[in-house]
Amino acid sequence: MAITKKLIDGLIVTIQNLYLTDDIPWMIGYSGGKDSTAAVQLVWMAIEQLPERYRKKTIYIMNTDTLVESPVVSKWVDKSLKFMKDESEKKGLPFVPIKLIPDYNNTFWVNLIGRGYPFPRKKYRWCTDRLKIQPVNNFIKNKIAEHGEIILVLGTRKQESSRRNRTMTNLEKKRVRELLSPNPTLANEL
C-alpha cells in the first residue's frame, strides 16, 4: 500500500475521532524504531490539529530502557523523549513521555550473572519479558487501576512477517469497538 497524503489525512481524522470518543487515556509504545515513531508522529499530528479545548485526554508515550542499550541509542532516546516533553508543554498538547526501566531484581546483569541465566538467544528470550514487557505492563496496570481502562497504541505492520500478519488479523476479529481490540493478557486494555 502506497503512503499518500490522502491516506495520512484519513488516518489523522480516524485518530481524532477515536480520541474524542471518550475520556480513556491513551498509551503509545515507543522504541524509537520506524513503526513506533510513525505511530507517535501520526497521533501527534492528529492531536496537534485539534482545537486546544479538546486536547484534554492524557497520552503517555512509553519507552522502556533495558539498561543494557548502547550509550548512543540511550542518549538518542533520552533526547527524543525530552524534545517531545518540551514541545508538548510549549504547544499545550496532552503528551507525557515517560521512560520505564525494569525492576532491579529483573535486570539483565542480575539474571545473567547473579542468577546464572544463559545469554539470551532466539529460542530462550528471557530478557524480552523481564526487561521490556514487565515494566510496561506494571505501568499500564497502575494506570488501569487509576482510570478503569486504557487504550494502547502500537506501531505494527502486517507486512513485517507472516506471523505478525496472522496475529494482527486474529486481533481484528476480536474487536469490541470500532478499531479497538482487547488485549488478551491485560484486562481493561484495548
Protein language model regions, located:
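ATP-dependent adenylation/nucleotidyltransferase module used to activate substrates
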Residues: 1-190
